[in-house]
Structure formats: C-alpha cells, structure tokens
Curated annotation (Swiss-Prot):
Entries under CDD domains matching the protein: ArgRS_core
BP term (GO), one: arginyl-tRNA aminoacylation
Enzyme Commission number: 6.1.1.19
Disulfide links within the chain: none
Keyword Nucleotide-binding: yes
Protein name: Arginine--tRNA ligase
One GO cellular component term: cytoplasm
GO MF term list: arginine-tRNA ligase activity; ATP binding
Family stated for the protein in its record: Belongs to the class-I aminoacyl-tRNA synthetase family.
Gene that specifies this protein: argS
Predominant cellular place of this UniProt entry's protein: cytoplasm
Length: 558
C-alpha cells in the first residue's frame, strides 16, 4: 500500500511541477511522507519556497487519484506534507494479515546473479567471511521477496596458490584428520603446516609452482587432487553456512573457465586492448589513465593465468546468462573490484555492481589463517549458542532440555545474523556478545521475543472477528508502521542495503511493545478487542515475514 501510494504522490507531484524525479522523505511525527521539492523549484521559478509550497499544495488538492486514496496534503512552511487516511490504513491492515505479506508479484526480468561468501577453501570460515555471507544471504532473500528471478552463487577458487600449497601438504606431510575434526579445520592444519615447511625450505616453492602449472594445463591427476581437497573444505563450509541459515543455489568452479577455454578467450581480447603491456609472456593492463597506479596482471611470466583473468571470464559468463550481476566483497577487495569493473567496461561488457563491506571483529584479535591465529565462525556459533542456552534456561527453566536447546539454536542464529546485518555495510563493527543476545535491546532475539509475544496473545485470545476500524493514536501509529514493510523491501533491493530491513524490524518491535503497554488487548471487549487483536495478527505476520527475510527463525515461544 505504501508503494502504491508513494507512486501516486510522485505522479501527482510530477504533473504539477514538471519534474521527473521528486525526492520524498519520511514525514516524521506530523506526516507520513514529505517533500522539499519547493527548494528545488525556487531556483528556477525565482520565488520563495514557502509560496511555491502553497501553490503546489493547491494544485495537489485537485488531484483525483490522491483524493481517492484519502491522502491529505498540506504545506508547513517550505515543506509539503502528506498524511494517509483511514482507507489507506484499512487496506494496509487487510494485506498485512495475509500469508506472504510484503511479497511482490513475480517478475520475468531482470535475471539477477548474486555472488557472496566465495572464501578461499584453505581453512574454516571466520567472522569476516560470515559478514559477507549474512549480507549476501539477506540481500538474496529480499530480492526474492521483491519478486526477482535470482541465482545465488559461490565462486570456488580451486586454482589459487593456497590450494596448491594445501595439495603439496597432503602429498608430503603426515597430518591425518582428527576424530570429530571438521574437514575445513583439517585443511587449515595442513595449510599452516605446509607454510611452515616452505619457510624452512624455500625450495619447496618450485614444487608448488609446478603444481600450479600442471593444474592450469589440465593434468588429470593434479586436477583431481586439487578438487578433492577443495571439496573437503567446502563440505566443512556447508556445515557452517547451514548453521547460519545461509544458502547458495550453485557453486561455480574457477577451473571450469580454464578448462572450457573462456579464460584463454578473455586473455586474447585483453591482448588486443591498447592498455595491454607485455614483458615476455607476462601480460598486464596499464590502467593509469583511469586512476590506477598498479598494473593489472593477467598472465604470469611462466604463461599461467592469474585469478584476475579467470574472474573476468567468470563475469563475462555471468553477463551471458543474467541481466544483472551483484558481488558482495570485503573492503580489502576495493582495488581489485574497481580494476575488474574498469576492465569489463574496456572489454565492452557490463560491469558488476559491488556491495563492499567493512569487517566485523572480535576482541580475540587476528584472523590470519596463514599464521594459524583466527577465530573461526564455528567457534563463534558454538560460544553464542552456549550463552543463548544459558539465557533461555534462566528465563524458561520449566522447559525440557531439548526444547531449550532448539530455542537456543534459533536465538543464537538470530543474535549473530542480526548483530552483523544491522550495521550499514560500509561501517566496521565489533561483535558484541551481550548486545547480540540482549532480549531487551536492539538485537535479533528482541525482535523474536516481540513476535513470540504476539503469538502468545493470539493463542490466548482464541477466535475473533477481524476489525479494521482503528480509533486510538497508538493503534494508527502501529498500523502505519506495519504498512511500511513492502516499501522497506523495495528500498533494500534498490539501494542494496539490507540493514534497512534490520532497522525496520526493530522499529516495528518497538512500536508494538509501546502499543501493548498503552492499549489493553486481551482485557478489552467487543469491537475494541477485535480491532486490537487484528492489529496483533498483522504485527505477528509482519514480524514473521521480516525475520524470515533476514534469515532468522520466527519462533513462537522463548
């Protein structure tokens, strides 16, 4: 309803101002939406913004579409405010009690490919990796909610130097898998041990180089070894990602773009670019004219391709199969991402959209896999789950242990996912154990608790007649907050900022708790009881849809 009403307001403003783009903002306490368009028009009309606002409002009052929607328009100084009427609130509530509220009709295009996580398979995922995963998965869920055809991909680096080192380690070192040790943790032990051997004997580097040459040439035995070790690590990743409720539709292997000739084809095109430079067989791009100081290497002096060339082949393939490509990358990939975008454009290809994120950290410090000092995502999940179980046990000691553990698993996942996604991607953050599991503050469990409270009220209430004739200020405030959910989904996918949904879910939980404090529900009677229970049903459904879009369980009891 907000989406349709907002579109109608924009159309009406465009008709009476002649402007194609009209900025609309939240109206705060006194309006549902507002615009500062009078300031923009003042420059061309040479009139005071206050006078322009009055003239625009006069024109809008005659707009039939806004009148039919029950939208009231008024000028407050240079600002134009829009207040939605009872018809809007009623329509929004009727939609909000339906399953799947906030979902947009399915679209045929654009077909979107979203790549996230894509961590090197040489050790367990750490906290930095899972911010990538959680941002990417939350975006994917929002895109699907918005009706877009979407494929979520993990790009598997099975040709990098790290994998060659792991393969050498398995060939030459005795490091069997420990009992109950995850595959990715085993891979990390071998990788760390192999690096130590290389530090002691630099001559091993030549053996690693040889492995890289063999895998590039397609040597069957070497390719088999690389894939075997990478697959084992991915099996470990799968457990971690499942525990975080993160899903991928496809795992795309880097080596496939060498095997099928795509990398060679991209390199051939790059050789013909005016920015190409050659030093023997070494091939690079000089992108200085675009502001890059370092050359963008495509092929080593030994004739083997580098990751960048294979990544270009991958993104060319994306363009052949999809209309829009989105990559989620860490801030440490800003240079690489910018070089990739620049080169794709030089090749006549559409550049991917990149969502960069700063890293999340823990007080424990370094996360360097090479040094063997990092906090794995598995350790984080285990610790948060333990703390969640203690909290649930304190709050609900009467529940049996199995139930408490199930609730703790959901609460822990909510704590981690929400604490990570609630921060705008471009901002760094420190994971706060206490805040992540705080049932009373800005946390995933706090929103889950509001949902569980709504479920409890509805269960105690039993049958009731749905009623949409709201009367009190708190009822209308809550209904209008519920009505904003579809527009938040639209904004998340437009701006690629999933934290906006996290913020909305918390605000909705807050608004519901305020409503519940001031407006008796179960103790009220007649039509008042029915309309408040209708609101509770709408809140419960909207919180459920919000939580599920954030990848968080909407549990019914806590």
């Amino acid at each position: 309803m907000v989406v349709d009403t907002t579109a109608a307001i924009k159309r009406a403003l465009s008709e009476c101002t002649g402007l194609a783009e009209i900025p609309l903002v939240d109206g705060g306490e006194h309006a549902d939406l507002a615009t500062t368009v009078a300031f923009a028009l003042a420059k061309t009309k040479k009139q005071a913004p206050v006078k322009i606002a009055q003239d625009v409002v006069a024109a809008l009052k005659n707009n039939r579409e806004l009148s039919d929607l029950g939208v009231t328009v008024e000028a407050k100084g240079p600002y134009i405010n829009f207040v939605f009427g009872s018809a809007y609130v009623t329509a929004a509530l009727k939609a909000a009690v339906q399953p799947g509220y906030g979902s947009f009709p399915a679209k045929e295009s654009p077909r979107i490919v979203l790549e996230h996580t894509s961590a090197n398979p040489n050790g367990p995922l750490h906290v930095g990796h899972i911010r990538n995963s959680i941002i990417g998965d939350s975006l994917a869920r929002a895109f699907r909610k918005a009706g877009y055809p979407l494929e979520v991909e993990y790009y598997v680096n099975d040709m990098g130097r790290q994998i060659a080192i792991v393969t050498w380690g398995f060939d030459h070192l005795e490091h069997g898998q420990h009992e109950s040790e995850k595959e990715d943790a085993h891979i990390a032990r071998v990788y760390i041990a192999a690096n130590r051997e290389i530090e002691k004997d630099p001559g091993i580097t030549k053996q690693v180089d040889k492995l890289m040459e063999l895998v590039e040439s397609g040597d069957p035995e070497t390719v088999k070894k690389f894939r075997r070790e990478v697959s084992r690590c991915l099996d470990g990743f799968a457990v971690t990602l499942k525990n975080l409720n993160v899903k991928h539709d496809r795992f795309v292997w880097e080596s496939d773009f060498v095997k099928n000739g795509d990398t060679k084809a991209v390199i051939a095109k790059i050789e013909n670019l005016p920015q190409a430079t050659h030093e023997g067989t070494l091939l690079a791009l000089d992108l200085a004219e675009f502001g890059f100081t370092n050359k963008y290497v495509m092929r080593r002096s030994d004739g083997t391709s580098v990751y960048a060339a294979r990544d270009l082949a991958f993104h060319t393939w994306k363009n052949q199969n999809f209309d829009r490509a989105i990559d989620v990358l860490g801030a440490d990939h800003k240079l690489i991402g910018a070089q990739l975008q620049c080169t794709m454009q030089l090749l006549g290809e559409k550049a991917p959209e990149i969502v960069h994120f700063e890293f999340v950290s823990l007080p424990e410090g370094s996360m360097s896999t090479r040094a063997g000092k990092f906090v794995s995502a598995d350790e984080l999940i285990d610790e948060v789950t333990k703390r969640a179980f203690d909290e649930v046990t304190t709050r609900r000691p009467e529940l049996d242990e199995a139930t408490r553990r199930n609730i703790a698993d959901s609460v822990a996942r909510a704590g981690i996912r929400y604490d990570i996604v609630k921060i705008s991607p471009e901002k760094s953050t420190v994971f706060d154990w206490k805040q992540a599991l705080d049932f009373e503050r800005q946390s995933g469990p706090y929103i889950q608790y509001a949902h569980a409270r709504a479920c409890s009220i509805l269960e105690k209430a039993g049958a009731f007649e749905e009623c949409y004739d709201l009367a009190t200020e708190q009822e209308i405030i809550l209904a209008k907050k519920i009505a904003k959910f579809p527009s938040v989904i639209e904004k998340v996918v437009t701006e690629l900022r999933p934290h906006l949904l996290a913020t909305y879910a918390h605000e909705l939980a807050d608004t519901f708790n305020t409503f519940y404090h001031y407006e008796p529900v179960l103790k009220s009677e007649g039509e008042v009881r029915d309309r408040r229970l209708t609101l509770v049903k709408a809140v419960q459904n909207t919180l459920q849809e919000s939580l599920e879009t954030l990848g968080i369980d909407a549990i019914h009891t806590m």
